[in-house]
Amino acid sequence: MNKFALGSHRVALAAAMALGTVTTMATAASAATLRVTIENLAPINGGFLTPAWVGFHDGTFDLYDRGESLDDFTGLESLVEDGDTSQLTDAFAADNPDGVQATLLSDGPPPLEPGELTSFTLDVDPATNQYFSYASMVIPSNDAFIANGNPLAHEIFDDAGNFLGADFIVLGSEVLDGGTEVNDELPFSTAFLGQQAPDTGIDENGVVTEHPGLTVGTILGTTDSSALNGLPLNFTGADFTAPGYQVARFRIELVDNQVEDVPEPGIILGLVAAGGLVAANRKRKQTA
């Protein structure tokens, strides 16, 4: 991987994120302000995470099903191959007119490095946004990702509107293979390992399965002193199939549950490009 390859991918990804950083489709009602935090728990020399897509919905938005092709789930393929959340953002907005979603950006250029965390605050309606879903690409890879396939897996509010919250860890055994690209792990076709453009991998035409892990001698042994700001980039700690390997932690906390007006149906887009953020990003680097 070289600086140009990494930089080009980061610029393209950041542009896509700016187009769909926050989308809200809530009606005037009682709102709760939530803080959503994702932390990359990978060890030193571990893998990176692309900016995570998160969504609050009524429990009907299905991101994927194991054993099924992503062709049947609009928007997720571009995320699992290239970390691009824009198509998923559009699909969610179309399917969930009362849903609330965001893409969690890091303090600096994407992606989220090992030991780094970032937070967003969002206003949601407990009556229509009881459940939480997430998705992020694990990189470098061809189409490895983490996401919840069960839309009812994370209940944030009960039927009475009481806040339940969430605090959970995604293990390496939960990393999935999108089945859309062959896992050749070649630089030209592997995101953040030298790929110059999106959607350049070899089509696999497969289904979503548990990821078999990265290949020893390719990604797991990659060291390139010119890759990341002139610093060595070593993925020898990126074997997420190792027992007990932790990939990410998600936390959802209640910041405020005061009754207030939520925007009438509409879309708030491009907050990053406009210079305003509803996010309170925090970054913590893992100490060596």
Segments (PLM) and residue ranges:
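Low-complexity, Pro/Thr/Ser/Gly/Ala-rich linker/spacer regions in secreted
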Residues: 30, 254-264
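Bacterial N-terminal signal peptides
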Residues: 14-24
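Sec/Tat signal peptide C-region and signal peptidase I cleavage site
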Residues: 24-31
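Structured domain cores in non-transmembrane regions
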Residues: 33, 41-168
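A short, hydrophobic C-terminal helix/tail in secreted or cell-surface proteins
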Residues: 261-281
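Extracellular low-complexity, O-glycosylation-prone Ser/Thr/Pro/Gly-rich "stalks"
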Residues: 165-257
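Bacterial N-terminal signal peptides that target proteins for export
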Residues: 2-14
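Short, charged juxtamembrane terminal tails flanking transmembrane helices
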Residues: 284-288
